[in-house]
Amino acid sequence: MTGQLVQYGRHRQRRSYARISEVLELPNLIEIQTSSYQWFLDEGLREMFQDISPIEDFTGNLSLEFIDYSLGEPKYPVEESKERDVTYSAPLRVKVRLINKETGEVKDQDVFMGDFPIMTDTGTFIINGAERVIVSQLVRSPSVYFSGKVDKNGKKGFTATVIPNRGAWLEYETDAKDVVYVRIDRTRKLPVTVLLRALGFGSDQEILDLIGENEYLRNTLDKDNTENSDKALLEIYERLRPGEPPTVENAKSLLDSRFFDPKRYDLANVGRYKINKKLHIKNRLFNQRLAETLVDPETGEILAEKGQILDRRTLDKVLPYLENGIGFRKLYPNGGVVEDEVTLQSIKIFAPTDQEGEQVINVIGNAYIEEEIKNITPADIISSISYFFNLLHGVGDTDDIDHLGNRRLRSVGELLQNQFRIGLSRMERVVRERMSIQDTNTITPQQLINIRPVIASIKEFFGSSQLSQFMDQTNPLAELTHKRRLSALGPGGLTRERAGMEVRDVHYSHYGRMCPIETPEGPNIGLINSLSSYAKVNRFGFIETPYRRVDPETGKVTGRIDYLTADEEDNYVVAQANARLDDEGAFIDDSIVARFRGENTVVSRNRVDYMDVSPKQVVSAATACIPFLENDDSNRALMGANMQRQAVPLMQPEAPFVGTGMEYVSGKDSGAAVICKHPGIVERVEAKNVWVRRYEEVDGQKVKGNLDKYSLLKFVRSNQGTCYNQRPIVSVGDEVVKGEILADGPSMELGELALGRNVMVGFMTWDGYNYEDAIIMSERLVKDDVYTSIHIEEYESEARDTKLGPEEITRDIPNVGEDALRNLDDRGIIRIGAEVKDGDLLVGKVTPKGVTELTAEERLLHAIFGEKAREVRDTSLRVPHGGGGIIHDVKVFNREDGDELPPGVNQLVRVYIVQKRKISEGDKMAGRHGNKGVISKILPEEDMPYLPDGTPIDIMLNPLGVPSRMNIGQVLELHMGMAARYLGIHIASPVFDGAREEDVWETLEEAGMSRDAKTVLYDGRTGEPFDNRVSVGIMYMIKLAHMVDDKLHARSTGPYSLVTQQPLGGKAQFGGQRFGEMEVWALEAYGAAYTLQEILTVKSDDVVGRVKTYEAIVKGDNVPEPGVPESFKVLIKELQSLGMDVKILSGDEEEIEMRDLEDEEDAKQADGLALSGDEEPEETASADVERDVVTKE
C-alpha cells in the first residue's frame, strides 16, 4: 500500500498520496475580512476622529474635539435581522468636548453618531436583511513610478508620476528635444526647472548646483522663460488657475495648499513607505563608480575611494554611514514656496552611459523622512526630479506597474474608513457653519453635530458601492471564494473597457499571492482574482506569502517561516516545495531548480535563501479542491474551479472518494458549518440545537462550566434560492475541542465539502446521444434521488396606502370562486403545507378602484349598503409560472404589532414555496476538471450498459471530450475512484503533490483490477458485449445551478410594449420569442407566405387582428384577414416627425387615412377585450393621462 492515512475532523480518514509534509497549517481562510474589519473598529475609527479634531470656527475661539468612541450592543441578533429585513448594526457613541476659549468653558457630551453595520462572525454584513460581502480592491499603491517610453520616431524617453492616496498628481516627461517637463495635476506641461524655481531655487546657478551639471538640464533651462522664483510662481498659477489675475502671494498659497497641506494631500502610510524606499540613495549607488571619496565624518576614516565600484559588499559596509549623515546637505531656499531648510543626501558618481567615463552626475536621495509625515515634502520633489535625470544617464530602474509590489489591497476596513472620512468631512463643514450662527454661550456639542452626512455616506457605501456585493451563497465554496475575491474594478480602480492585456495577465509576482487559475471567463477575466491559499495581507495592504527560511551558514532549511511581499521576494532565490531534503533539512541535490525575479534557474544549493512552504500555496481554495490538477490544461482547470462554485446543494450530499484534503478546511472556514467555540462534552443533540457543557482545566482536574447552546438553521432560503440546512454530526457524550465542527452546513458531509455525488461513469458513445459533450444518465439517479435538490423561493405581497384608500389583505376577492380560495385561511393567506400550482392564489388582496361618476342606481346602493359597494380590483399575489411547490412557511408583519415597515406599507406577507427538483433532461452537470455537459437522455436502468457482474453504470460521457481538451485529470480520477470504491477507502491527492501514475497503478492492482482499468461492457438492450473494452470508474459529478426548470418558458398571450405594441422579451417579462431578420429570410426562402404574414401581424403587433384571432380560435371560427401592424404606423409617425410628408396610397393612387385602416367597431372591440396578463401599469398610465387632460380643460 502506498500513501499514509490522515485524519480530517472526527469522522473521516483519507489515504493521502502527498510526499511533502505540511510544515505550516493553512491560515483561517476568511481572515482577510475579519481582521481588516477588526482593525477598522480598533484603529481606523480612532485615526479618523484624530484627523478631524479639533474643528475650530472661523474666529478660533470655539473648538470641538473628539475624545473617544464606543460601540453598543446590536439591536437584533443576526438571524432576527435577516427575518425583519433590517441592518445588523450597533450604535456608535462618541465622546465630544467643546471648548470656548473666550470664557475657558469646557463641555463634554456623549453624542450618538448613528448605527454602524457590524460584521458577522463569518465575514459578512446584513444590510436590510440581505447578506452582503465587501470585496477587497486591488489598486495602484501611492508612490513614485518611473517608466520608459518610445516616441513615434523610435527615440527613447521616460515618464514619471508621483501618485498620492489623495491630492494632486505630479508628472515628469521628456520630449524629442531632450527637455524635461512637469505637469501639475494633469494641466499643460511646464519645464521642470519652473517647479524648482517656484520651490525657492531661483537662479540657473542654484539649479545647476542642486541637480548637477548635465545636458538635459541645460536644454530645460534654455526652454525655461522664467528667470526667478516670482515669475515661476506666476507661471504655475496661470496653468492651475487660468483666467484669474495672478499674484505671487496667491501663487505661493495655492502651491502650498496643493502639495504641503496634510488635509489636501495624503500619501498614507503606504505611500510614505514606498517613496522612502524608492527615493533612498542606496538603490541608485549599487554597482556604480564613485566620483568622490566617502569619508566617515566622525573618525575621518576613508570608506570608499573615488573611482571605486560600489559592489554589494562595499555598499553594505557604507550603508550604516549613509543612514548617519554621509552626503547630507542642508539647503536654504528663498523667495519660493518653501521657507524652511531642506535636508537632502547627495553623492557624486560617474555616469555609466558616458563612453569616456568622465561625466559626473549627482545622485540625490530624500534623506529618509519620518513615517508620520503623510504629505509630500520639498525633499521628495527634488529627489524624484534627481531620480528622473539619473534615469536619463542610465542610473536607477523603471517600475513594472503590474508587479504586486506596486499594487495593494484595500480591504473592508480601509474602504469603510475612506467612506467614513467623506461623511466626517461633510459633517465638519456643517459644524463650522453652526458655530458661527449659534449663540456661543448656550451651545452644546449635540446641537453642533449633524450626523446625517455620516450615516448617508455609510448607507451609500453598503447599499450601492460596486464593491458591496450580494453574497454568492449557492454553496459553501461559493461563499468562501466570494469573501476571498480581489477585484481591480470599482471606484478608484480600473474599468473593463480601459483595462488592457497587461493588467489582466498572470505576472510572476502573483506566485503564492493570487491564484493564476481562478478568474471569470468573459469581460472580467484577469480583473477579478482570488487570494492564494496561504496568502496574508500586511499592514500596508501588500499581499505576503510564507516561505521557509534557509540558514545561510549551514545551508539547512530551518523551522522559521517568513512572510514576504512581492518586492522583498525579488531579492531572494526561492527553491520549490518539492526540492529534496534529508532528515537534517539540508538539500540532497547539488543543483536545485529555483526562482529568482520570475526566472526559473538552476542554482547551487548554497545560493538558495528560501523554500516554498507547500505546493498548493500557488492556488486558491477552490482550485486546491481539484484532484490531479497538475494533469489538466489550465483553461479547463479554470472552468473546473469556477463551476464548483455553481454546484447546487443536494438533498443527500456525499464527499468525494478522490479528494485533495482541502475539503475539510474549506467546509470549516466557509461559515456554513457550526463550529465549537469552547472545549467541552456534548450533553444533548436535537435537529435544531446542540448543547455543549464547557469544561476547564483547574490544577489538572476537569471542572464543568457553563452550558453552551448552538442553534442550527433549518431549511432557510439562501441568497440564491437554494436550501440552507444544518445537521448535527456529533453525538451525546462526545468530547469536543475548540474549532471542531458540530454540525454540517449545506453541501457538506461529515465536516467535509460535498458538492456532488460519486457516480459510476463510462467513457463511451451510445447512439450519438452524447454528441457535443451531452451526458446520458441512468434513471436510477432520478429514482433514488441521487441528484435531487431543494429550492426555496420567496414571494411577498404588501398592503399599501393608495390615493383612493388603503389596500386590504382579505379572503373576499371579486370574481374568484370558492375552489380557488380553498387553501386560504380566514385572513386570506395561504396555509402552510398546501400544494400550489402556477396561477394559484397565495395572498388575497384588493385595491380600491378609481371612482367614476356614479349612476342613480349605484348611488342608491351606496346609500343603502354604505362603503361596502365601493369598487375594488383584485391585486392578489399568485404563483408565477414555474413556481409551484409546497408552502414551507408564511411570515406576516403588521404595522399595528409594532413591526418596522417601509413608509406607506401597512402589512407585509412573505410566503416561502419549496420545490423538490429531481434531475431531468436539460439540466447542466460537470466534473471537477472543466468537463461540463447537458443531460440529453435519461435511460431506463435496464437499457444502460452493464459491467460483467451485472451492475449498470450511472452515466455515459463522450470519450471525444478528453483528448482535445487535455484535462486528463478526469481519467486519473476515474481510475482512482474505482479503486477507492473497491477498497472502501477515501483518498486525498493534493494538488501538485498527489498520486503519480505509478501510485494509481499500484492502487488499482491492490483493488484487484487491471492496470488500464478498462472493462468489458454489455449492451443493456441486447445483452451483447460492446466491441471494445471501456474505461469505467467512479467520478465525482456535480449538478450546476443552471437548471432547465428555471429556463423553460412558454407564452400564448401576455404583455405588449407600449409604443410598438409588440410582445415583450424574456422569461422575466413573460415575453415572446424573437423572430428576427434572419428568421424572416428563412421563411422567405421557403416561400411560406401565410406563415410569414401571420408572424409579422396577428402574432405580433396587429392590435385589432390579434384580438379577433384570439376570439376566432376560442369560438372555433376561421381566422380573419390580418390588418396593418402597429409598427408600420409608428414608422410613418417617425418619418412625419422628421418633417417629411408621408402619405399612404392605395393601388389606384387614392390616399388612405390612418384611421380608415381599421373599422370603428373593431377598435371598440379591441378596447373591450383586455387580454389576460396585459400590463396593468401601462393601461392605468394612459388612462391617467387622458383624465388629466380632461380636468385641465
Swiss-Prot record:
It comes from the Bacteria. GO terms for molecular function: DNA binding; DNA-directed RNA polymerase activity; ribonucleoside binding. Keywords: Antibiotic resistance, DNA-directed RNA polymerase, Nucleotidyltransferase, Transcription, Transferase. Residues 1149-1193 are annotated as: Disordered. Pfam families: RNA_pol_Rpb2_1, RNA_pol_Rpb2_2, RNA_pol_Rpb2_3, RNA_pol_Rpb2_45, RNA_pol_Rpb2_6, RNA_pol_Rpb2_7. GO terms for cellular component: DNA-directed RNA polymerase complex. It catalyses: RNA(n) + a ribonucleoside 5'-triphosphate = RNA(n+1) + diphosphate. The keyword Transcription applies. CDD domains: RNA_pol_B_RPB2. Its EC number is 2.7.7.6. Residues 1184-1193 have a biased composition (Basic and acidic residues). Gene3D superfamilies: 2.40.50.100, 2.40.50.150, 3.90.1100.10, DNA-directed RNA polymerase, subunit 2, domain 6, RNA polymerase alpha subunit dimerisation domain, RNA polymerase Rpb2, domain 2. GO terms for biological process: DNA-templated transcription; response to antibiotic. Residues 1149-1162 have a biased composition (Acidic residues). RNAP is composed of a core of 2 alpha, a beta and a beta' subunit. The core is associated with a delta subunit, and at least one of epsilon or omega. When a sigma factor is associated with the core the holoenzyme is formed, which can initiate transcription. DNA-dependent RNA polymerase catalyzes the transcription of DNA into RNA using the four ribonucleoside triphosphates as substrates. Belongs to the RNA polymerase beta chain family. This is DNA-directed RNA polymerase subunit beta. It comes from Bacillus subtilis (strain 168).
